[in-house]
């Protein structure tokens, strides 16, 4: 065994996955859902883990679209939506409707394929999930708004944030330049600098 032992990250929304996580993993992961939905999951996982004499750390997965203004960020999200044809959306949603994945079912239910109901919580956009399987929500907004949403999810109990974007490099730049300084000033990020690093840990 390596020393120190690397933490085990694991995600799954089914009862079977939750039982495995409660007994074996270090960090339980959830896809980005509205706060009320993920708060219920954290509470359930805390109870399951406590029954095993354990306590878990919690992480959440989002895409990010952030710019200096909210209007700029939403313009990018809307442009992405404009490139999703009705046929592509319908095909993807049909595929998702037959999945055995509980997490995928929950993602699809956020919008039910309706392009008019994609902001499922302030700054939480489910548009990516119209055509993409897996994590289908993005934090969309100004630097301040995205930082506020991260703070909100942190207060629910999430200490790990697994973030990505389209394109990855460019969105990492905007997040690093605009959002990280705010989170650092709020004391929510340890070890975050403007220099490349292997990991940044949220408190």
Predicted regions and their residues:
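Alpha-helical segments flanking ligand/cofactor-binding loops in enzyme cores
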Residues: 18-22, 151
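Hydrophobic faces of well-ordered beta-strands that scaffold small-molecule active sites
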Residues: 8-11, 26-30, 56-63, 161-164
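An alpha-helical appendage that flanks or caps ligand/catalytic pockets
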Residues: 33-155, 184-203
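A local structural motif
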Residues: 3-7
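Structural motif
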Residues: 23-24, 156-157
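Glycine-rich, proline-tolerant flexible connector loops at the mouths of alpha/beta enzymes
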Residues: 32-36, 160-176
């Amino acid at each position: 065994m390596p020393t120190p032992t690397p933490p085990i990250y694991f995600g799954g929304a089914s009862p079977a996955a939750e039982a495995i996580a409660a007994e074996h993993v270090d960090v339980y992961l959830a896809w980005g859902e509205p706060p009320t939905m993920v708060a219920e999951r954290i509470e359930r996982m805390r109870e399951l883990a406590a029954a095993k004499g354990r306590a878990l750390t919690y992480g959440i997965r989002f895409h990010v679209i952030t710019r200096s203004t909210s209007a700029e960020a939403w313009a990018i999200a809307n442009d992405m939506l404009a490139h999703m044809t009705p046929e592509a959306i319908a095909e993807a949603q049909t595929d998702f409707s037959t999945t055995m994945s509980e997490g995928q079912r929950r993602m699809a239910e956020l919008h039910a394929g309706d392009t008019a109901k994609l902001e499922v919580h302030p700054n939480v956009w489910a548009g990516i999930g119209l055509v993409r399987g897996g994590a289908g929500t993005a934090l969309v907004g100004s630097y301040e708004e995205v930082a506020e949403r991260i703070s909100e999810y942190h207060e629910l109990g999430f200490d790990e944030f697994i973030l990505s974007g389209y394109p990855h490099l460019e969105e990492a730049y905007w997040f690093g330049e605009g959002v990280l300084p705010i989170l650092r000033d709020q004391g929510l990020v340890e070890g975050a600098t403007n220099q490349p690093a292997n990991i940044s840990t949220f408190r």
